[in-house]
Amino acid sequence: GRHATYSSVDLQFLGLNTNKDVKSLKDKALCLAAPYAPLDGINDAGLSCGIYMTYQGKKTVATDQNTSKPDFTSTTMLRLMLDYASNVDEAVKIAKKYDLHDSAKTSYHYMVADASGKSAILEWVNGTDATDNDGSKRKLKVTYKNLSKTSKLKKNNSSQIITNFIIEPGYYKNNSE
């Protein structure tokens, strides 16, 4: 079934002037698209999702996969996960079913977490930062939070961190792992 969700949306991404009230019919119609442009959110099962810019490629190339899978944009992918996934594994399964087409002429990655404490970072990459200049060749890579006792994380620290940088090992070839 479909989950009840809370999400946040930046209306500027829909072309609205956030310094003015929504009065015109055109602006009101644009607001109807807001549920399909979330930047983060949580659902009633405890699944939370967030989307973060990654600026991949020499001139920031958007992910633009073109296989036989159905197409989704970055924010509608997040909406789909919030509406239909109850946990991290279900969110990853949803992401694997679709070709991603990033919006706003940039690239993104996602963090998903669920009520059990499991989390994952979903990234679409192709090679290294020096070679990742063709968004159509990117593939989904999933990095799960390491909950093992041999994790480099402190014993009582069960967090996973995301920034605006790709975390896929070896992506930034000039940087040490």
PLM regions: where:
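Short arginine-rich
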Residues: 100-107
